[in-house]
C-alpha cells in the first residue's frame, strides 16, 4: 500500500496546498490503492519549537511512503530519511490538494 501525504491549508480536496511541512494546518493522506483520502489536523501547528519533528513523527505513525510539501526543516528531514520516507518539494502556490492528486495519477 502506498500512502502519500500532501500538506494542506484545509480539510477537503479543494483546499490549497500548504508549502510549510511542520506548520501546515492539515495533512491529507492519499491512498493510491483505494484512491481514498483522509485528513488529519496538525496538532502541532502552533508549537513554539519542534513542529517539523512532531509532524515527521506523525508521518511515521501513519506509515506513509512519501510527503509532498514545500519545505522541510533539517530535523524533520533527518527523521524522515531515517524511516525512508520520500520528501517531494514543490513550490506551486496555486495548487490544490486535488490538482496534486491528479498529477500523481498521470
Q: Which stretches of residues belong to each language-model region?
A:
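Non-catalytic interface/targeting segments
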Residues: 1-50, 81-106
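N-terminal active-site wall of soluble small-molecule enzyme domains
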Residues: 52-54
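Mid-chain, well-packed structural core segment of small domains
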Residues: 56-88
Amino acid at each position: 500500500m502506498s500512502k502519500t501525504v500532501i500538506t494542506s491549508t484545509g480539510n477537503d480536496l479543494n483546499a490549497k496546498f500548504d508549502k510549510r511541512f511542520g506548520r501546515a494546518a492539515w495533512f491529507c493522506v492519499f491512498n493510491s490503492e483505494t484512491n481514498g483520502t483522509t485528513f488529519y489536523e496538525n496538532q502541532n501547528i502552533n508549537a513554539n519549537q519542534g513542529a517539523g519533528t512532531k509532524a515527521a513523527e506523525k508521518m511515521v505513525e501513519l506509515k506513509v511512503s512519501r510527503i509532498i510539501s514545500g519545505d522541510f526543516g533539517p530535523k524533520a528531514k533527518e527523521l524522515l530519511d531515517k524511516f525512508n520516507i520520500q520528501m517531494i518539494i514543490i513550490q506551486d502556490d496555486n495548487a490544490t490538494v486535488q490538482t496534486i492528486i491528479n498529477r500523481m495519477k498521470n
